[in-house]
Amino acid sequence: LGDVYKRQKYTNKDWFVGAKSVLGSNLTQASGLGGFGVKSVNERTGEQKYTPIRFSSSWLNVVYGQKWKPGVFVGYAKNLGTSDELYAPDGKAQLYGTGTNLDQLVTAGAELTYNVPHWKFGLEYTLSSAWYGSLNTSSGKIKDTHAVCNNRIVAVAMFMF
């Protein structure tokens, strides 16, 4: 299966709505989550064959207004495991990539910006929760997860010319 993505955007005088969904394998080449793992090793030559880690992610962003612009953002990413069983003769599989021990990630945020000619002032709060765990070598999925949360507040003053 190749990478599949869908992006939608709607704008008018008062509204901006944007959304994107991606389903793919080894999305690290596009700065995404994923990678690959060793699925077999030729015992005579040491040659390795690989299987990709599949990820799905989606997000939605909605902003309303002209001078005062409140907005919300939500996002979700899920590790779908590997296409094939991983090679793990000693119980430890070899994985290469980004977020290889991440099961899922949820992000939600709210923002408020004040916009006048050449200036934008804003405040944003974002909560992100990531579930990390250990690897199931038969499916490449993550099991025995625990959540880690992050709170972020960002203030901005931007001059546009």
What kind of region is each of these model predictions?
Residues T11, Y50-F55, T100-Q104, T113-N115, ...:
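Short sequence motifs at beta-strands and strand-loop junctions characteristic
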Residues K13-V17, S56, Q66-P70, P117-W119, ...:
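Outer-envelope beta-barrel architecture signal
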Residues Q29-V38, E43-T45, G81-T98, L102-D103, ...:
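Outer-membrane beta-barrel translocator domains and adjoining extracellular loop/strand segments
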Residues A147-F161:
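Outer-membrane beta-barrel "beta-signal"
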